[in-house]
Amino acid sequence: MAKILVLYYSMYGHIETMAHAVAEGAKKVDGAEVIIKRVPETMPPEIFAKAGGKTQNAPVATPQELADYDAIIFGTPTRFGNMSGQMRTFLDQTGGLWASGALYGKLGSVFSSTGTGGGQEQTITSTWTTLAHHGMVIVPIGYAAQELFDVSHVRGGTPYGATTIAGGDGSRQPSQEELSIARYQGEYVAGLAVKLNG
């Protein structure tokens, strides 16, 4: 049995929705145990609520538990072309895992959300830097998801990982195509994890 963690941060719910689609795809793979968790919120509750943050039911992960998984699929919104501060704060607490090599050889993949032109690909590839320092095997999705070839309308999705275009005010929710790419990413990573660890 390969253990897959879908680990995310979501302020307004876009990445939360994508995380559930990633997990749905991963659960299609026989021999994959899939768990969804989120990183802790770093904003004071009153500021989070005032900013319109969405309450989420996923349990909160601890940095130490990352070593328990065979694959980790990280989801983060874009903040100035990088991962969110909450995800950065969480990953900055993994120094002990780095020192012991606890994540070495584990699969790592990333999905993201952003406004149009907000840096979705840069967010994914800059997150890969942290995964590389841990010795994780980085898993992009390439162009195997056919939705990536549809240019008839605005949508997220890259060869690096699933994305959604949230729009400047956050009103645009993930489209069915974007969710399909996210499901593909989950299924693809889980399939590799089972082959390597199942």
UniProtKB/Swiss-Prot annotation:
Pfam families linked: FMN_red
Keyword hit for Thylakoid: no
Coiled-coil portions: none
Domain Flavodoxin-like residue range list: 4-189
Name of this protein: NAD(P)H dehydrogenase (quinone)
Substrates-to-products reaction catalysed: a quinone + NADH + H(+) = a quinol + NAD(+); a quinone + NADPH + H(+) = a quinol + NADP(+)
Record EC number: 1.6.5.2
Necessary cofactors: FMN
HAMAP family xref list: NQOR
Source organism phylogeny: Bacteria, Pseudomonadati, Pseudomonadota, Gammaproteobacteria, Enterobacterales
Endpoints of the signal sequence: none
Organism (species): Salmonella paratyphi B (strain ATCC BAA-1250 / SPB7)
GO cellular component: membrane
Record: residues binding FMN: 10-15, 78-80, 113-118, 133
GO molecular function: flavin adenine dinucleotide binding; FMN binding; NAD binding; NADH:ubiquinone reductase (non-electrogenic) activity; NADP binding; NADPH dehydrogenase (quinone) activity
